[in-house]
A protein has these predicted regions:
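Assembly/oligomerization interface modules of large self-assembling protein complexes
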Residues: 2-82, 149-150, 281-282
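Short beta-strands and strand-coil junctions in structured, solvent-facing domains, enriched
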Residues: 34-37, 94, 274-276
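Extended oligomerization regions of viral-like shell subunits
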Residues: 40-41, 138-265, 269-271, 291
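A residue-level signal for conserved active-site and pocket-lining positions in enzyme catalytic cores
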Residues: 47, 107, 267
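Beta-strand elements of well-folded, non-transmembrane domains
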Residues: 51, 90, 271-275
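Short helix/loop capping segments that flank catalytic or ligand/cofactor-binding pockets
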Residues: 55-58, 95-96, 175-178, 185, ...
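Short intrinsically disordered coil segments
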Residues: 61-65, 101-104, 182-183, 220, ...
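Alpha-helical scaffold segments that mediate packing/assembly in large oligomeric complexes
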Residues: 73-76, 81-161, 206, 284-285, ...
Length: 291
């Protein structure tokens, strides 16, 4: 059971509440849903990366059998701490259930958005042992959306992998909704009433704000990605650490909050996560080019 420590005693955060926060974070993160998941020890772990598959061969009864020679390498996966501080009014201190509900409703989405944004390269990575999809090749889907998607999928196949998941941003969704065939019918939605993009080229599609990366001086505007998500691993250190204080001063974008003076308290939540992937198994989807 996680504990909310204060200067005036302690409030217990039930295990089921902590578990629900973690579960909803995973459900809110497209990257977490598509990637393989492992439990990560605090000191990190070395994981094997297979860069090529073993190739079998037909042989006659007495001939030598082919010896598989897959290309193997390793990567160090490190747990990096993600933290957020959320201020509350004192009325939540009088009602623990209201506090728990507020935590469950407010924390997961923000944690998930930051994680996805970091994986896509919108946010600077926390350390060298955290991979980002910004290393993957980008394919323009702005002018001929269908051909751009096929080019990205083909590149992944040529590299020896199989696409099994698209992640698009709201901006990418707009491009897909605007793609039409020669008769003017939408290509990527079942009906105009749905307004969603459930699948692309027969592959599962998910949406997250974190998949959008604004155009840079030498990089295109990124609106999504596609890849073989068996080549991506999310590691998490069990549990979410939560503590509370009513004697602190918070620096926010809007100014300074003195918790004691303003009759408030703040909850700090921390979780440790890691991410590793084989970027050759992924392609980014761009709205235009870098030029």
């Amino acid at each position: 059971m996680a504990e909310l420590k204060t200067g005036r005693g302690a409030i217990d955060l039930p295990t089921e509440v902590s578990s629900e926060i973690i579960q909803k974070t995973q459900e809110s993160s497209s990257v977490m849903q598509l990637s393989r998941s492992i439990t990560l020890p605090g000191r990190g772990i070395t994981i094997p990366v297979i860069a090529g598959d073993p190739e079998p061969a037909w042989v006659n009864e007495t001939e030598k059998k082919k010896v598989a020679d897959p290309q193997l390498s390793t990567k160090k996966m490190t747990a990096y701490k993600m933290a957020v501080i959320v201020p509350f009014s004192m009325e939540f201190r009088r009602d623990n259930s209201a506090l728990y509900n507020a935590l469950v409703n407010r924390l997961p989405l923000k944690l998930a958005e930051l994680f996805d944004a970091t994986v896509f390269g919108k946010v600077e990575k926390p350390g060298e042992n955290f991979d980002q999809l910004s290393a993957a090749t980008a394919y323009d889907i702005s002018k001929n959306t269908y051909d751009g998607l096929v080019a990205a999928d083909t590149a992944i196949a040529v590299a020896g992998y199989a696409s099994n998941g698209y992640v698009i941003s709201p901006q990418g969704k707009g491009i897909l909704l605007g793609a039409k065939d020669t008769t003017g019918r939408p290509l990527f939605i079942n009906s105009v009433a749905e307004g969603a993009v459930p699948m692309i080229l027969g592959t599962t599609t998910m949406q997250t704000k974190g998949a959008y990366v604004a155009k840079g001086a030498s990089t295109p505007e990124i609106v999504g990605a596609v890849g073989d998500w068996t080549q991506a691993v999310v590691g998490s250190v069990s549990g979410i650490q939560v503590s509370v204080s009513d004697q602190a001063t918070l620096d926010t974008s809007a100014g300074t909050i003195n918790l004691w003076q303003q009759n408030m308290f703040a909850v700090r939540a921390e979780i440790e996560l890691g991410f590793r992937c084989n970027t050759e198994a992924f392609a980014r989807l761009a709205n235009g080019t870098a030029a």
